[in-house]
């Protein structure tokens, strides 16, 4: 069952933790890709210097952050990579959760070819773990880019999130790659499933 709209209309911390174990579904090139969300980070613009929406900063790039929860926010970094976020809260809240890592569940050859131009069986053990163990890696594997910005995630389309009854222990720790964010560096707003091998950093 697809997660409903109400799931997303909550605080980013709740949504980021709640997304763990849920299933990201991508339909592309006639193929259905599914990945279990195993790592997320929360960003709350009103108090978070690491957020693109800190202090109400609104630009064309950050506008999705100010929409009602349940849409995709995809941005481009370093002129090379994309990152996929799930917007949370009410309109104008400036909140969201970065999807940091997935555990791929099917169509391994497709995502392996996307990432490494090799079939899954040709990959080393290390490379198999690296298919989707980072925000840009999962975007490459699942073909997520700027065309997916603003997409509604609570309706069936080519990008949505399904519920799951996954049981797991959640680890809470600091976020990655935000050395500029002053006191927000220490916020324990990164969440991951304990002992999952696809987590980007433990």
From Swiss-Prot:
Q: Which NCBIfam families match?
A: 3mg, PRK00802.1-1
Spell out the Gene3D superfamilies in the cross-references.
Answer: Methylpurine-DNA glycosylase (MPG)
Instruction: Provide the species name.
Output: Clostridium botulinum (strain Eklund 17B / Type B)
Which of UniProt's keywords are assigned here? DNA damage, DNA repair, Hydrolase
Q: Family assignment? A: Belongs to the DNA glycosylase MPG family.
Q: What is its EC number?
A: 3.2.2.-
Q: Which Pfam families match?
A: Pur_DNA_glyco
Name assigned to this protein: Putative 3-methyladenine DNA glycosylase
Q: Please provide, alphabetically and separated by semicolons, the GO molecular function terms listed in this UniProt record.
A: alkylbase DNA N-glycosylase activity; DNA binding
HAMAP family from the entry? 3MGH
Lineage top rank: taxon: Bacteria
Which SUPFAM superfamilies does the UniProt record give?
FMT C-terminal domain-like
Biological processes per GO annotation:
base-excision repair
Indicate yes or no for the key word Ribosomal protein: no
